[in-house]
Design a protein with these regions (language model features):
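An alpha-helical support segment within catalytic cores of ATP-dependent transferases
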Residues: 4-10, 124-136, 141-142, 146-186, ...
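ATP-binding pocket architecture of kinase catalytic cores
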Residues: 32-144, 156
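ATP-binding glycine-rich phosphate-binding loop
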Residues: 17-32
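Juxta-kinase regulatory segment immediately upstream of eukaryotic protein kinase catalytic domains
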Residues: 1-20
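Protein kinase-like catalytic core scaffold
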Residues: 41-42, 68, 82, 185, ...
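Active-site activation/catalytic loop segments of kinase-like enzymes and analogous catalytic loops
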Residues: 145-157, 217-252, 266-275
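Active-site acidic catalytic loop and adjacent metal/ATP-binding pocket
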Residues: 30-35, 119, 173-219, 231
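Secondary-structure capping and boundary motifs in well-ordered enzyme cores
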Residues: 142, 188, 210-213, 261-266
Length: 275
């Protein structure tokens, strides 16, 4: 914490009014809130430089396109600490958990899908996928990796007997289906309500995209609407899917999106079970 605080105070040119850590959530990244009399900031400390570089790369592109993502104000020389925009006190996940599915949360979910559509379409042709963190695209390698998490769950946790060759053939078939899903573009990968901030004006912001890669555009839509913790009712999911499809004006694109929904839904369920 001390290094992050010193870096922040060097940036603001004075002692911080307040400086405290945020709870970690399944990541090695450490986040802090630093305050001046007029403004709050997020200070992030992370030893994983390739992960940081991916975040910096995407943030620069997103800021240039005026998307709903944090601006980065300063990066340390060793690329391990950075100061970013403070975008709200609560995640969308916290709001859903507290309020349930009311008119406010429905509006926030709809806004999230609209902002996702904006990100997907405005970044088309503007991403160098060689700069991604772990995988350039959601192809055979990450798909197979996800499926083998599920295999370990079946074999090691539930101890359900299965025919190995048959299961592997099914994996191969599903991998091929996922690889052929269209349209493709920027896929955030971990597009969950816990990674979406909501400010005092009920505007949503995406904050966790360092693992983004090229992939089927329906992946993030399905990840978001079918996340277990939100527990959206099926009729609301269908309503929001229709809302998302209506944003696309090309009928062939909508047809492709609809055709890719079921295979992606299946692999997302398998990922959740495997994790």
């Amino acid at each position: 914490m001390e290094n992050a605080k010193l870096f922040f105070e060097e940036f603001i040119g004075e002692k911080s009014l307040d400086f405290y850590s945020l709870a970690q959530s399944g990541s090695a990244r450490k986040n802090f809130v630093g305050s001046t009399p007029n403004q709050q900031y997020i200070i992030t400390e992370n030893e994983n430089i390739p992960e940081n570089e991916s975040f910096f790369y995407f943030s620069e592109i997103f800021s240039g396109l005026n998307l709903n993502t944090p601006k980065i104000f300063k990066i340390s020389e060793d690329r391990k600490i950075y100061i970013q925009e403070f975008l709200g006190k609560h995640t969308l996940s916290e709001i859903i958990e507290k309020e349930g599915l009311n008119e406010r949360t429905k509006s926030l979910v709809r806004q999230t899908l609209e902002k996702l559509f904006q990100l997907q379409t405005s970044t088309e042709g503007k991403i160098d996928y060689s700069k991604t963190f772990e995988y350039e695209s959601y192809d055979e390698f990450p798909v197979t990796n996800d499926l083998f998490y599920f295999k370990s769950f079946i074999a090691d946790v539930l101890e359900i007997p299965y025919h190995k060759a048959t299961l592997l053939k099914e994996f191969k078939h599903l991998t091929s289906e996922i690889e052929n899903c269209a349209p493709k573009g920027l896929m955030i990968r971990d597009f969950q309500a816990r990674n979406i901030m909501v400010n005092d004006n009920d505007e949503v912001f995406f904050i966790d995209y360092q693992s983004a890669m090229k992939g089927p555009l329906m992946y993030d839509v399905i990840s978001f609407l079918y996340q277990a913790k939100a527990n959206f009712p099926e009729d609301f999911r269908e309503e929001m899917l229709s809302c998302y499809f209506s944003l696309w004006k090309d009928e062939n694109t909508v047809k492709e999106l609809k055709n890719s929904a079921k295979p992606i839904q299946l692999i997302r369920f398998m990922q959740v079970l495997g994790a």
